[in-house]
Amino acid sequence: MPQKPIWSNAKTHQKILKKLYLFGFSGTPIYAENTQGFETTESVFGECLHRYTTIHAIRDNNVLPFCVSYHSTIKQKQDFDTSKDKQVKAIDTDEALLSLQRIDYITNYILEHFDTQTMRNAKAYTLNGKRLRGFNAIFATQSIPMVMQYYKEFQAKLDKIPESQRLKIGIIYSYAPNDKLESLESTQGLEENAEINALEQSQRDLLDSAISDYNAMFNSNFDSSAEGFQNYYKDFSLRLKNRELDLAIVVNMFFTGFDATTLNTLFVDKPLRYHGLLQAYSRTNRILNAARSFGNIICFRDLEEQTDKALALFSDENAKSVVFLKSLEDYLNGYIDDKGKKHKGYLELLKELQAKFPLTNFLESTLTETQKRTS
């Protein structure tokens, strides 16, 4: 059952209060395409009065554009027997997504590219009286079992690195005191009620272990009791905002209502769509300083189609050129924009320069000048 939105009583209020005027403000309104069982925003509040979209915010320098890259880590439909029923195919897919080879590949990728993606070699800046270089990241995963797999793999690899060079990695997911595991599809309410989901014993044990590692990193004393977990969540959130944590591995937390100007990168290994996708991406595009010119999104799932759909729904079908920076491949090889205009890439421009101003002529003239001076 989808959760009741906070504005679900609006129609009741309108019936009782005949002269009531309601103004609804929403960053990601509910349309027919993304209702998921809810009423649309228009059916509750009426016709939209004004739209201020991501395009406007970027052009007004209120937020940054995104740079999105897609990394194929699993073959899609052709890998799975279409004759199987949905439940069996889902099991096959889960096994492939949680395979040790895939987890190892993605973990290695993040560790090898972390400093580059989070700009650790950029010019230092001051935050809360501290001098910092670069930014930090969130790693969004599909499920608690996936968080567990990744955390174990990261810890195993970090143990082989000198302590001074290790990333500070933390995980957080919510549970209830009983053993009834519930759906983690919705991101609503997790921050307000961190005990909404129950955990199996193995999941609870790993969370305890991760909190213990966190305590060792920051000389704290949190635990997974009801009060202890709430305090852990608050401290975790604060350290993420202050860039004391390098990487937070999560399932659904910190995707809505969490703003950290030091957070520039989102690694994604989960399905996202419509408002959930834009809310997750938008954790990375807050303005801090000149070193940050875009929000950095690295997808280990094929989210390109869902990304385009979300942008078209909440902004404009032609917004892509404003909201998303071109890929490195486009800048290297050239591209054709939405209006059909061709833009030459770096490689083609370099060839043109070499043809017009060959280095052989430069070397010959330099040699001649040198000979004149020595003769």
Question: Which residue stretches match the model-derived regions?
Answer:
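Signature of the SF2 helicase/ATPase Hel1-core->accessory helical subdomain module
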Residues: 1-92, 103-107, 255-325
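Alpha-helical structural motif
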Residues: 9, 50, 102, 106, ...
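Conserved C-terminal RecA-like helicase domain
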Residues: 95-250
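Hydrophobic alpha-helical scaffolding
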Residues: 3, 43-44, 57, 93-103, ...
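Conserved coupling segment at the C-terminus of the helicase ATP-binding
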Residues: 28, 72, 141, 366-372
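Long, hydrophobic alpha-helical segments
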Residues: 288-375
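Short, conserved secondary-structure transition motifs
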Residues: 30, 142-145, 171-182, 299-309, ...
